[in-house]
Amino acid sequence: MQIFLDSTDTKVIADLASTGLVDGVTTNPTLIAKSGRPMLEVIAEICDLVPGPISAEVAATTHEAMVAEGRKLAAIAPNVVVKIPLTRDGLIACAAFAGEGISTNVTLCFSPTQALLAAKAGATYVSPFIGRLDDYGFDGMDLIRDIRAIYDNYGYETEILAASVRNVTHVKDAAIVGADVVTIPPATFSDLFKHPLTDKGLEQFLKDWAGTGQSIL
């Protein structure tokens, strides 16, 4: 499973990307607004930091305007993925981008039938929002399971990008049910490394090693 960072903080992205474990980055208008920086500048910088797919979202609501904005975003760098909402106009734009060879991430997916339409429109990625479904009393992982089954039934190549991921358990569950990608906040990425028994075991190993008086170097 690929791991993307959901962030526009270029310093944090650079730091976490240095692990070699970051496969891509997703952004959205809210994160861009929080950055306080020009969108095109932020996306260009992220594209330089991470060679993998970088999702940049359109702000338009009509398919004509989405296509115009998407073309401008795609021109920033070869690894830009144009992010579009799962609306009727969004899917019309998605099909247009597919015809032009522009990668897309269809976002705000909350049902299997929406995901089916995204695949039929030629989406590169579809982003089911797991945490938001959980907030309303649904099981977001059921959505990923259903999408996985539909895509496997018909051989769709659209990748399932689990979004609105809140914690390590979400990451684990998304991997189990077959998500191709998970996008997570930097804090959750850092939490993936942690387990109290790892810390406890390392502490004991180092204590025992120190008692030997040896040095490897």
Swiss-Prot record:
Catalytic residues in the record: 83 (schiff-base intermediate with substrate)
GO cellular component: cytoplasm
Repressor listed as a keyword: no
Example GO biological process: carbohydrate metabolic process
Reaction equation(s) it catalyzes: D-sedoheptulose 7-phosphate + D-glyceraldehyde 3-phosphate = D-erythrose 4-phosphate + beta-D-fructose 6-phosphate
Subcellular location: Cytoplasm
Similarity comment text for this entry: Belongs to the transaldolase family. Type 3B subfamily.
Annotated function: Transaldolase is important for the balance of metabolites in the pentose-phosphate pathway.
Protein name: Probable transaldolase
Organism: Caulobacter sp. (strain K31)
